[in-house]
Structure formats: structure tokens, C-alpha cells
Amino acid sequence: MIIDRLFDSVEKKGHVCLGLDTDITYVPEEFCKKFNSIEDAIFNFNKKIIDATLDVVSCYKVQIAYYEAYGLKGLLAYKRTLEYLREKKAIAIADIKRGDIAKTAEMYAKAHFEGDFEADFVTLNPYMGLDGIEPYMPYIEKMEKGLFILLRTSNKGAYDIQYIKTQGGKNVYDEVGEKIYDLGQKATGRSKYSSIGAVVGCTHVEEGVEIRNKFKNMFFLIPGYGAQGGTAKEVSLYLREGNGGVVNSSRGILLAYKKEENGEKIFDECARLAAINMRDEIRKTL
């Protein structure tokens, strides 16, 4: 199962999930000038980053909005990035946060688990209910795909909805967690984790630890590290026996070159060093 591949990748390479949230403004100017289109500039920037970090990060998260913003050329860069990750046998999470139901959800599943935009995992928004998740289940069962469903996110606005009390006196995120957990029991691998995981931000540690203790075989995609205030020590509390989650960093790695003199010329090396430092920081806390 795909979750076992991710588990093994964490064991071997550490917990870093490198976010390829690539804006054209992140691409060093001199490197960008080598290419005649946004598509080529973004893809080749991503390719250099991937080549430099493949052995030190567990997976890559590709946020589709950064590519959609540039229209067809951006989506071609997105497609080529996912293809290159498959070629390199790297695990790709398509950060699409889809949340529709029925036939529309079927089409989203087909779009992102097959064809041009094929990825290993996708992120989903559960707000419309489980009938927005069920159309993805055949891909989990038959094609070894996986999901990360928004549970307790790292943004400030999480309090607007996720903390609303239900009739049973629980927070909305508690109820969502229970439903995700129950659904995930159908997709548990040899690692004892499920291919239906959750997005749990590391900016509210008490709740994160509570979720970890309650849902022991739920694998976490953990945003909020670094720029949003999450630390390696806090991240370690979300893990079980050194595994059970990957920690996303995007700008902290992609833009690491900006901290170095003449870093634009070695942006890929700077990204590699930033990923290694992040990996080692997390490992020290385990």
C-alpha cells in the first residue's frame, strides 16, 4: 500500500515533506532567463530542487494553486513536475484540497489519480461530508493511492469552524477525526497506518497531541513548521516511535538560497542543506 511506501521512506530519509509551492518569483532571475516560458522556468527549477533533495526528503507536496495561477503553462509545469517525481520513484502529494460530492468528486479523483495529473496522495476538504470522500476509495483499494483529509489545520481561521461545538459537546475537528479514523480502517497497511491520513498543523500542540493519542494509526501531514511558528520539538510530539507523520516545508527550503551570499547560483545546494538541517533538527528530538 502507498502508506507503507511512505512509512518506509520516512524510516530511510526522515520526516521532511518538501513543498513545491513554486511561484515564478522564487526562481532566481539569472536561472529564469535561461528559459523562454514560465512553464520551462518553473519545471526546471523544480527539477533542480528534486535532484538535489531526493535522498534527504521523504516525499514532495505540490500545491496546485501555484501552477493554476499561471494558466495552461503553469498546469503544464505541474504535470511535468508530477511526471518527473514518478520517474524518480518519489512520493507525490497533490495538494488540491478538493471537497465536492458525487459525480464531481469522481471526476476529481480521476483527474488526480490518473492521467496527466497523477499523484500518490491528494488532500481533501471534508466539509461536505463522507460522500465527498467515498469516490476516492476505489483508487485507494485498487491503485494504491492515499488521502490526507483536513482535520486540525495550522491557520488562525481554524477556530472559525473547526472548534464549533457539536450537539454531543465535541469540537467539529473531533467529529471529523472519528469519521476519518473509521473510514481509514479499511485501508490499513503492514506498517499499521492507514492510507487515509489527516492534515494536522503543529501550531496548536495540545490539540495535536490529543489527536495523536486518540488516533494511533492515522498518518499525519503536518504543516505549520518554521514560518508559522511550529518547532522540531513540537513536531516530535505528533509522531509515534519516530514515524507516523511527515512535516511540510515550502519556502523555508525553496528560498533558502536568499540567506546566502551569491545563493542564486547554488539555489539547489542551499535547498538540500536546508532540508538536511530540518531533517536533523527533527531527528534530534526523537
From Swiss-Prot:
Catalytic activity: orotidine 5'-phosphate + H(+) = UMP + CO2
Record-level GO BP terms: 'de novo' pyrimidine nucleobase biosynthetic process; 'de novo' UMP biosynthetic process
E.C. designation(s): 4.1.1.23
Involved pathway(s): Pyrimidine metabolism; UMP biosynthesis via de novo pathway; UMP from orotate: step 2/2
Enzyme class, first EC level, given as a word: lyase
Entry-linked PROSITE patterns: OMPDECASE
Active-site residues, Swiss-Prot/TrEMBL: K97
SMART domains noted in UniProt: OMPdecase (SM00934)
Origin superkingdom: Bacteria
Keywords: Decarboxylase, Lyase, Pyrimidine biosynthesis
Pfam families: OMPdecase
Family to which the UniProt record says this protein belongs: Belongs to the OMP decarboxylase family. Type 2 subfamily.
NCBIfam families in UniProt: pyrF_sub2
PANTHER family: OROTIDINE 5'-PHOSPHATE DECARBOXYLASE (PTHR43375:SF1)
The protein's name: Orotidine 5'-phosphate decarboxylase
Organism: Clostridium acetobutylicum (strain ATCC 824 / DSM 792 / JCM 1419 / IAM 19013 / LMG 5710 / NBRC 13948 / NRRL B-527 / VKM B-1787 / 2291 / W)
Gene name per UniProt: pyrF
